[in-house]
Structure formats: C-alpha cells, structure tokens
Amino acid sequence: MPISKIHSRYVYDSRGNPTVEVDIVTETGLHRAIVPSGASTGSHEACELRDGDKSKWAGKGVTKAVANVNEIIAPALIKENLDVKDQAAVDAFLNKLDGTTNKTKIGANAILGVSMAVAKAAAAEKRVPLYAHISDLSGTKKPFVLPVPFMNVVNGGSHAGGRLAFQEFMIVPSGAPSFTEAMRQGAEVYQKLKSLTKKRYGQSAGNVGDEGGVAPDIQTAEEALDLITDAIEEAGYTGQIKIAMDVASSEFYKADEKKYDLDFKNPDSDKSKWITYEQLADQYKQLAAKYPIVSIEDPFAEDDWEAWSYFYKTSGSDFQIVGDDLTVTNPEFIKKAIETKACNALLLKVNQIGTITEAINAAKDSFAAGWGVMVSHRSGETEDVTIADIVVGLRAGQIKTGAPARSERLAKLNQILRIEEELGDKAVYAGDNFRTAINL
C-alpha cells in the first residue's frame, strides 16, 4: 500500500527541547512517530540535525529537519510509490536521498521519524501489532520474549549535580517470573529508594533527574550502590534484583593524558588523582565483587579501544559489558568491537543509526557474534513507544528506559505490560537469561 501524505512538525521532548514528529497517511489512516534525542552523545552517532540559531531554543531548533521531511522526503517518497511493508526498500531510498554516510544532509532525526512512521503504517496494513511486524522484518523465531527492564534509579555524571562521576545506576528485576511482576518489584524498590534518599540526603534529594532517577549529592559509586542495595533489602528482594551501571566514561576521559578524571565536575580537579584504564578496570572488578552487578555499560571512553579489550580479557564473562558510545549502533564499529573483543553486548538506540532497517541489522550482527542486545531510550524522550515494540519484536530480552517515574519513561514500560497481557502464554519473560534471550 502506497503513502498518500507525509507531514512533519516539531513538538517538544521531555527536556523541553524541540524534536521531530512525522505523520504518514495511507488507506489505513494516520500513523505517527516522534524522534528522541540524547544528552551524552557518542561522537560517531548519525547526525541529529539542529538549526544552530542561538536566538531560538538556544540553537536546538529542528525546523530544518522538519522542512527536510516536508520538502525533500515527502514528495520524493510519495512519487517513488513504495509499499510501506517493504521497510528495507523505504529505508534504502531515504539513505540514498540523503547520500552521506551519517545522514548529515537531511538529518537522522528527519529520516528516523519517517522510517518509524512507515513501520507503524505497515503493521496497520497487515493488521498486526507493531512488535509482530518488527518480528517479521527481523525474522526472529517464536515465542516472543518480554524484556527485563533496566531501571535507572540513581543518576550521576552528566545527568546530575553532586560529584558522582558514573552516570546511571540501574536495578534489574531479572529474578521475577514475569514482566508484570518485574515492574511491581522495580516500582516497590524505587519507592523505598526515594524515601531512603530523602532520609539520608534531605527532602530535595528525592527530586528526579531527566530519566526519573534520584540525583542526591553522592560522592562515590559505593555510596550509590549502598543506597540501592539497602532499598532492595527494605523491599524484600535481596538476591532477586540485580544492579547495572552505565558509566558513560567518555564524559570524564582526558584524551591527551589518556586518563580518567572521577572528579570531572570540579573545575579545580586534581590532576595527580586522575587514573589509568587499568586502575579504573580494577575499580569495576572490586565493585562487581562486592555488589550484585550484572552489566556495565561504557566502562571506558569511546576511542579508548585498548582499555575495552583489556577489560574484556581480564574480567572474564562474569558480567555483560555493553558498548554504547563505543558502538553507536553502527555496523562498522560493531564489527570492530567484535573483532577486537571489546565488549559482549550492544546498546541499541534507533536514533544513533537513523532507520528501522539499520537498527534491526545492528541487532542481528550482534546476536550473530553471541552478544546481548539492550534496546534503549534517550534522555530526551517523548510519549512515542516504538522501542517497546522493537525490544519484543527483536527478542532482545532487555530494555533500558528509565525509572518507573515520568510518563515518557513509563509509556514504554506500560506498553510492554499491554503486550504481555495480549500475548499471554505466547510469550516468555527473559529473566536471568536476558543476555541470551535470542536463543530462548
């Protein structure tokens, strides 16, 4: 079924910044997608086109990207008369229209909005849910797998004040029997965590960051992990709920010195206290020995490949090492990471690569190498729930979409609750097998 109309506009994301929304009209009606955006972005990501006009939205406007959809993509794609069910052909056409390697001409945010809306239109035409269409596109087997939610409950790094260098601490309810129960456990721990945080750090420490986690004035990773393990214990889930970290260490890597500055938010940081990657790797190993850590994302900087390979080699496969800034959902970097044994899991962000087809291929490349795949939101999110359907359709088994707070985060988690209810016994919960869910 061809497309009769494509229209884009700007709307606002969860940080109050403009972002791209795309409507596609076919015989089945209107299909809408909204594109997210990140705060700590990898330097190799596909180009998110912003206006750069400092007099409006501090340069973060997306009127150029919107115009590119309305004036370049819309007439060309409608004229091409492609079937919306042929996602690969649509995405290839969009990439050809752009003609650059990282979508700098039209903008990945413009292209992705169209790509996502096309997938929704195709699902409607096939009269199946979006997750079932994604499953068809990626050729995954049945039953469907419901993901373990990685809930970011304590924020540090670039997402928060305080001196804590690591960006995210997540709870992982992998011991639950179902997604519904995992959500309940996670929500209960989150409530305990909020009240503990207020008790220890004062009332205002209960305020939440961009992704719904608390951001108290914490100095060290141990302090954050103690707070979380205490909350897990108070909620009665010790042993069932694990912990994950996203270090986002590119944010505090000093490239010239090849060292890491754990006090990077202090303008007068003491250079003599900056540490080597070996010292940082030792810290991770000590933390993993003391706390139930099952996954560490971006433990080293995106260009510090040597550090990644060293850590992979010396840490064994006890926990998941996730590449985000390292791999930026890009087939070239994923291939390099596989060859150099840099990590064993991919963080999949559709807006890092810019089309549904390329996101699916990135996941398939990762699965083929025996990696895990974690589907992820961005810190600037919207009410769009496409990634909830993607994680189920891909059988990825793990999703990172913030704390059980703030509607733009819960929109995705609530969508997975609905999917679980709809599928009933035609789905299994990934649980402790989240790293190898594709094989379940």
UniProtKB/Swiss-Prot annotation:
| Protein source organism | Davidiella tassiana
Note one Pfam family from the annotation. Answer: Enolase_C
Q: Name one GO molecular function term.
A: phosphopyruvate hydratase activity
Report the locations given in the UniProt record: Cytoplasm
Q: According to its UniProt record, which protein family does this protein belong to?
A: Belongs to the enolase family.
- What residues does substrate bind to? 159, 168, 297, 324, 376-379, 400
Domain of life per record? Eukaryota
Task: Give the EC class as a word.
Answer: lyase
Give, as in the UniProt entry, the pathway in which the protein acts: Carbohydrate degradation; glycolysis; pyruvate from D-glyceraldehyde 3-phosphate: step 4/5
The name this protein carries in UniProt is: Enolase
Listed InterPro entries: Enolase, Enolase-like_C_sf, Enolase-like_N, Enolase_C, Enolase_CS, Enolase_N
Q: Which residues bind Mg(2+)?
A: 246, 297, 324
Q: Which UniProt keywords apply?
A: Allergen, Cytoplasm, Glycolysis, Lyase, Magnesium, Metal-binding
Q: Please provide the Gene Ontology terms (biological process) for this protein.
A: glycolytic process
Which N-terminal residues, if any, form the signal peptide? none
* Co-factor binding comment: Mg(2+) is required for catalysis and for stabilizing the dimer.
Q: Gene for this protein?
A: ENO
Impact of mutating residue 141 to A/Q? Answer: No effect on IgE-binding
